[in-house]
Regions:
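Conserved C-terminal beta-signal and adjacent last beta-strands/turns
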Residues: 3-9, 151, 197-199, 204, ...
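Extracellular/periplasm-exposed beta-strand and loop segments of Gram-negative cell-envelope proteins
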Residues: 15-20, 133-150, 190, 223-229, ...
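Transmembrane beta-barrel architecture of outer membranes
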Residues: 153-159, 169, 188, 194-198, ...
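Face-selective signature of the C-terminal outer-membrane beta-barrel domain
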Residues: 200-388
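Surface-exposed extracellular loop regions of Gram-negative outer-membrane beta-barrel proteins
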Residues: 218-225, 386, 391, 405-441
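Transmembrane beta-barrel domains of outer membrane proteins
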Residues: 1-5, 157-163, 173, 202-204, ...
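Transmembrane beta-barrel strands of outer-membrane/channel proteins
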Residues: 2-8, 172-178, 210-214, 331-337, ...
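Periplasmic-side early beta-strands and strand-to-turn transitions of outer-membrane beta-barrels
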Residues: 1-192
Length: 441
């Protein structure tokens, strides 16, 4: 038996661009007012790449380090003299004849030391308080610019069955599929070229069954939209260049009389010069970033994990002649092996694949009374995961038949589930610099 299925559709593209604050409101932040123009630190809900942020004061701090280095070299390595000279240069921007405007201060700094002239906007801006409370984010991209919304799904199924005898049948089944879609989980993901296959071999008879199956995943060319956009911005223009460019332009425009918002918009235009626009997701540059694993400085997540399962059960009623006592005895067991393989992009498996073994066994004894009016069952199972202590879970139930197709069921049971593979081993970097960590790494 063979079956095929193909589906194609237009996926939804997220278009909520509300400004989002990660530091106010609820524990996870909240949507706030403001656009890119009104908030230099704008972080759009479905805008990708604008999660990179910095305060202008921190940009000044890094520049200050460079200035001190140049002065120290000029004073033959004398750090004390360099600090004193820096204090004089900085003080000239605070008050005095050279603090009138940026042009005057730049000329003063150039006269003091020509090598320091490029640093004038940063010292002047800090001295005049232009950086206080100003945080700035990189310019991001809309989801429609980076994600292909065409969803595809192709499936093939097939099976072969062989009758060994009147009571026993063997079968081999295969299921495989591939496709593209857009997925929202801990972040927004473009799932492209995803592959999933399962192969099952089973032999079953009247009173017993044994089967084994293997599931294989392949994430294809899937990528994290947020991380990819941030790295794309860094590749086009590193933040170590973008922020100093923005800061210098911002001070220039503020000194020229522009208000805070207009100066910020103008400075962004200067810093964004040469920035690709439009459908960047189709560009070779973006694809190169999306093709590099997250663990190596790109946006691609890899998942070639596998699951192997062997399970069996046996109805021992006939073997032990329990039918004459109106009783049934069923036993079974299962063995699982997880092989996690994401090369450090999803799980904490940078050093190599992570294996997890899990097994379990169960038994159930049932007995019927009063011409099947009452059925009492006792069952229990024991499960063990190599990362956790074993657990025994019992169950007792009674079913009373009060009329045809009418029953009363009374039961007591316990249940337990081991943490999932992600609960145990996830190590995923998501938007805003947040990292999801499992309980075991």
């Amino acid at each position: 038996k063979i079956g095929f299925q193909y589906m194609e559709a237009q996926d939804w593209l997220a278009n909520n661009t509300q400004n989002y604050s990660r530091t106010t409101g609820t524990q996870n932040g909240e949507a706030i007012g403001g656009t890119r123009y009104h908030d230099p630190n704008y972080d759009g809900v479905n805008i990708y790449g604008d999660e990179t942020t910095s305060s202008l004061s921190s940009i000044y701090s890094s520049v200050r380090t460079g200035v001190l280095g140049a002065l120290t070299a000029a004073y033959g390595g004398n750090a004390t003299a360099a600090n004193a000279a820096y204090g004089q240069l900085y003080g000239a921007a605070v008050a005095g004849p050279y603090s009138v405007n940026l042009t005057t201060y730049s000329a003063f700094l150039r006269g003091a030391n020509a090598a320091l002239a490029p640093y004038a906007p940063y010292l002047f801006g800090e001295a005049r308080g232009l950086f206080t409370g100003v945080n700035v984010s990189r310019t991001g991209y809309a989801e429609s610019d980076i994600i292909n919304p065409v969803a595809k799904n192709f499936k093939v199924t097939g099976s072969i069955h062989y009758k060994i005898d009147d009571k026993t049948e063997a079968s081999f089944s295969a299921y495989t599929g591939s496709g593209n879609t857009v997925y929202t989980g801990s972040d927004r993901y473009s799932i492209y070229g995803l592959g999933l296959s399962q192969f099952k071999l089973e032999v079953k008879s009247k009173n017993w069954m044994i089967r084994g199956y293997k599931t294989l995943e392949n994430s294809g060319e899937s990528f994290n939209a947020t991380i990819t956009a941030r790295y794309f911005n860094e590749l086009v223009k590193p933040s170590t260049t973008w922020y100093p460019t923005y800061t210098a332009a911002f001070v220039t425009y503020r000194d020229a009389g522009m208000n805070l918002l207009d100066a910020g918009a103008a400075a962004r235009a200067v810093a964004d010069a040469g920035r690709p626009t439009g459908r960047i997701g189709e560009s070779d540059l973006f694809k190169s970033v999306a093709g590099i694993p997250i663990s190596k400085g790109g946006g691609r997540f890899l998942d070639k994990s596998q699951l192997t399962v062997v399970e069996a059960n046996y109805n021992l009623t006939e073997l032990f002649g329990l039918e004459k006592y109106n009783a049934d005895l069923l036993v079974g067991g299962i063995i699982k092996n997880y092989s996690l393989n994401s090369q450090g992009t999803l799980f904490a498996d940078t050093a190599g694949k992570i294996g997890i073994n899990e097994s379990g066994a169960y038994a159930q004894l049932s007995k019927r009374y009063f011409d099947d009016i009452l059925k009492v069952s006792f069952s229990g199972r024991y499960d063990k995961n190599e990362n956790f202590a074993g657990r025994f879970t019992p169950r007792v139930s009674a079913v009373i038949k009060v009329a045809e197709d009418n029953n009363i069921r009374i039961s007591y049971q316990q249940a337990y589930r081991f943490p999932t593979t992600q609960n145990q081993w996830i190590n995923l970097l998501v938007g805003g610099g947040t990292r999801l960590m499992g309980g075991l790494p």
